[in-house]
Amino acid sequence: MVINKLILLILLFFCKISYVFTQKLPDGFCPSPLIYKNSTDRISDINRGYQFIGETNCVQPCPSLVYSESDWKNFFDASLYGGAISIFCSLFLLITYSPLVNNKHNRHTISIMFLFSGIFIMLASNGRVFWNNNEGYFDRICPEKGRFARQSDRYCLAMGIFYQFGCLTGMMWWTTLSVDVWMTIKKIKISNRQIFYYACIVNFLAIFLTFIPIARDQYGASNFGIGCWILGLWDQVFGFWAPLGICLTIGCIFITLIMYEIYKATGQIKKKLLLKYYKPLVLIILMFFEFFYMFIFITYIIDHRNKYNDEVAEYIVCILINSGNPNYDEICKIKRSIPPAAQFLFFLFSRLMGFEGVIFYGLTNQTKRIWLRSFWFNNRISLKFRSSFNISSSTNSSTNTFEKQTPSHLVDPIDQFDNIEISNNQNIELSQIENK
């Protein structure tokens, strides 16, 4: 008897859904938060980003119902302020390790430069960092009321390209950095030509995987994001999540190998290895967990996508059935299977990478040396200024010495450090990375 009642209730529920989603509502009427859309070309409007509710002229609001309005604002603020700080941090590192400042390149500095160039481009996808700040919270992803931005919207396309290319570049060069640290410890060297070919291949892959979705018209704003990215599930898997999974696997292997090399070293060698590599190693591990969290979170969303759709459908059925009740907004409450805190961490982690980079690569002796030996500190104007400063703060004799010979602090410290050998004729070379 109980089973029969349960079956009857289920049948009645699905009959309600079928009735609600096939009925025609009065023109111009849609219960809040649904939005009325007078559509003359339904297919075209769907392609433009409107999400119609069944056969009605009601569309889902933008941003979507998956989170409350206050949750969406919190996500946006975290992205805006965290991204604004991080983008300037990554820009500083990009300039520092670029040919504009750094005139001595090796495998390691090239990896750092491309890594933070990718992070900078990814963060630049947050249009409100560069574009009009006077617009509303979500005007870039919701260009019209109830419409999710699509590739045909120029800002949406720009956001999608920047985010996709930046993420791909960042994660592939993060993997390269983990391999490079291990190769440095093992004294494995490769030629400049090999480095050049590798950089071309990696950047070509990033460009290829970025522009394939454009040909398939796949960039747009989704129910889960605060920007534009790839919409189709299989396009996401092929264009991003599969490459990320490969990068995470390679990165995990080489993190383990690095830790093993440090573990098996003894005495002074272990101390020197720890002192030399703890900063890049900690950064690599932090970014591994951040990329890994992004991977796990999106897997969770994909796994719960149908459940989310059912929750939204149930909520919409409720408000349509109870729209005649003035208290329907209190009767109908949407269930949210995706915790807002988990989504918040997803946005936060992707916008902390530039800040972390400055901590582990910006506040180092290597960064100081790069700037001190750069053109910007060794041109006629800067040398004249520094000479004047020394005159005002030194004795006449020290001033004459400064004018007659190159100051000791302008001698390339990296060259000096590269000549230092580890005592006891040990065979571990520590000269390529300096992060004291």
From Swiss-Prot:
GO terms for cellular component: membrane. It comes from the Eukaryota. Glycans are attached at N38. Residues 23-74, 131-156, 216-237, 303-343 are extracellular. The keyword Aminoacyl-tRNA synthetase does not apply. PANTHER family: FRIZZLED_SMOOTHENED-LIKE SANS CRD PROTEIN B-RELATED, G-PROTEIN-COUPLED RECEPTOR GPCR FAMILY PROTEIN. This is Frizzled/smoothened-like sans CRD protein B. It comes from Dictyostelium discoideum (Social amoeba). The gene is fscB.
